[in-house]
Amino acid sequence: MVKRNINLNKCASRQRGVALITVLLVFALVAVIATELLHRSQLNLRSVANLVDTRQAYYYALAGEAYARQLLARDVIDGKGEIDNLLEPWAKASEQPPFEIADGEIHIEIHDLQGRFNLNSVIDENGLASPTGFPQFKALLVALQLNNNYANEWLDWIDRDQQRTATGAEDADYAGYRTAGAPEADISALRLLRSMLPQDYAKLAPHIAVLPENNAAINVNTADAAVLRLLSPIISDARATELVARQKSGGFRTIEEFQQAAGLTQSAAVPIGLNSNYFEVLITVKYANHWQRVRTILRRDRGTQDGPVSFAVLNRVRSPLIDDLE
């Protein structure tokens, strides 16, 4: 009888021990689940906060773009739009202090795309190699000490046929995607060329643009020396440097004045002008520890004497993170 009671007590003790362990395991499991839920909740909150901040930074960038439009519109309204030069407020936007906003700032740059070489001018209206634009692109590459085979690859990228040009490349040479076979909308398409190197793209980018008009005039008041040399073989490096120096003091008031300064006795190889309709707007926003860059290509339509100045967005690209901010 005594042994039986002892055995019963031992069984009861073991059962209480098992129950205690079970309770502890349940509490541990609940604690793990609660911790995981709390961690996920914190991640979700951070994710939502980052999304909200990124979206707000983008809206600030659009506000900066709207301000850039006002500068470009005011240039026309004030009667200065007939001549666009580097002394005008839109051209000096990057020299102004950033706009201060709550927990951040907005930096604005405006660049005249008609002061750059138009990559789409490499082909003519029939989608074939242009007798002027194609060799000019080669000349630009040589002037920048870059591989002039890029010109062949670019021509094959945007021309309408599938015939390789010298060292060029057509659809069969690009695994996973095809050539455009038409004028491009953004210079970043150059990155897709078969042999394009990142450092070469970075060196070439400040001198080029892609415009919807193959024959858009080059603005001699904003073009850099490398582009000015493309206008005529008689424009030497030294002469191009002198022309750029003139730009810094207001540039040229007439085409004849430029031709005389450049030593041109006949028309330039491409159309030239004194004003511009195509601009690149770069907006960099710092907001709540977030960086946002928006690059917009604008076409400015001057309107009529009674009509307002209007703008068309040809392209807009944004990047939440940037690595080239100075």
Residue spans for each PLM region:
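Short coil/loop residues immediately preceding or within conserved phosphate-binding loops
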Residues: 15
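Compositionally biased linear targeting/interaction segments
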Residues: 2-8, 18-326
